[in-house]
Amino acid sequence: MGFLKVLATSLATLAVVDAGTLLTASNTDAVIPSSYIVVMNDDVSTAEFSTHREWATNVHARLSRRKNGETGPGKHFEINGLKGYTASFDENTAKDIANDPAVKYIEPDMIVNATANVVQSNVPSWGLARISSKRTGTTSYTYDSTAGEGVVFYGVDTGIDISHSDFGGRAKWGTNVVDNDNTDGNGHGTHTASTAAGSKYGVAKKATLVAVKVLGADGSGTNSGVISGMDWAVKDAKSRGANGKYVMNTSLGGEFSKAVNDAAANVVKSGIFLSVAAGNEAENASNSSPASAAEACTIAASTSTDGSASFTNFGSVVDLYAPGQSITAAYPGGGSKTLSGTSMAAPHVAGVAAYLMALEGVSAGNACARIVQLATSSISRAPSGTTSKLLYNGINV
């Protein structure tokens, strides 16, 4: 259940064809047939973007390429200047659209899957105690009473059981890009949200939580759905005001996607801190997205003895480690569950980001650097080229 991964490996590399605008997968197992993500050039205006979509619709209709159910341009997104849209085309139509000088690139859509001081004694999960201590073996979580107050947490995942007592009425439903069922039928999203901001199990116990459902009950979704969820969260944050107190967690991923990485970069540029799971394949995290997005804070999983978890991804794109093995947190239906994975590690960091925003006023853009600055060099035998930094909330600094 940890880091939710693409069902089959794909897009291990991206080849560029047709004037560098149409990206193709070297391994097509996870590619959704006739589904694309179209990304526009940075200098395309909103008006030009609208005109392009009308033109693309006409091209699709004129060429009579609807015989296989392709419907042409679909939902569009504008994430802090990143403009694009999802589309259902056949490959020839996609090539025609890619020839428009306004188009930066087109890539196939793919499947992704579901990644005053207060002392809380006898914590229900060892991870909480570990992040407020510079040594292993502690059993209390020590934190400032601000506890993420005034910060909004966006859980981009399978949804959140907003009625769970661990959220104390602080969790709200945001959007659902998957289905018409505004519940967490999987449990992964509730668990990660609880780790970040639950009253009992979480780091930032006073933060507001918003459910952004991009994965279904089976834990699967699409890159385009993830981008749509990010787009919604950016717009929601802007509607709440530009105070910079927003964090997002994406404990999910798939193979490398330029579109997902570009969306992640623009989430951060918009003023939202972004924590992402490194992945659970025991391989270099640079092969997956959004873990490989440079602007995101990419998190590997540690064990209770400060080891690098056997399953965790690694490499230079990892910013730091956080507790990710045998983590207990809330689960739909009022109970709890113990899970392992980088999916469990990432929300610890999202929670600390919210905590530091409330306590120190750190900005979203500087939060990852501040977290790394506070982290201890505690991980033993980290894989070559991977940081040994372990999450620490800085309570005794």
From Swiss-Prot:
Q: Which PROSITE patterns match?
A: SUBTILASE, SUBTILASE_SER
Taxonomy of origin reads: Eukaryota, Fungi, Dikarya, Ascomycota, Pezizomycotina
What Gene Ontology cellular component terms go with this record? Answer: extracellular space
What's the family?
Answer: Belongs to the peptidase S8 family.
Its keywords, alphabetically, are: Allergen, Glycoprotein, Hydrolase, Protease, Secreted, Serine protease, Signal, Zymogen
Active-site residues from the entry: D157 (charge relay system), H188 (charge relay system), S343 (charge relay system)
Where does this protein reside within or beyond the cell?
Secreted
Positions of the Peptidase S8 domain? 125-397
Q: Which ranges carry the Inhibitor I9 domain?
A: 35-113
Q: What does this protein do?
A: Serine protease.
A Gene Ontology molecular function term for this protein is: serine-type endopeptidase activity
Q: What is this protein called?
A: Subtilisin-like serine protease Pen ch 13.0101
Q: Where is the signal peptide?
A: 1-19
The positions flagged as glycosylation sites are N113, N249, N284
Note the site residues: Important for catalytic activity: N280
In this entry, which stretches build a coiled coil? Answer: none
Stated EC number for the protein is 3.4.21.-
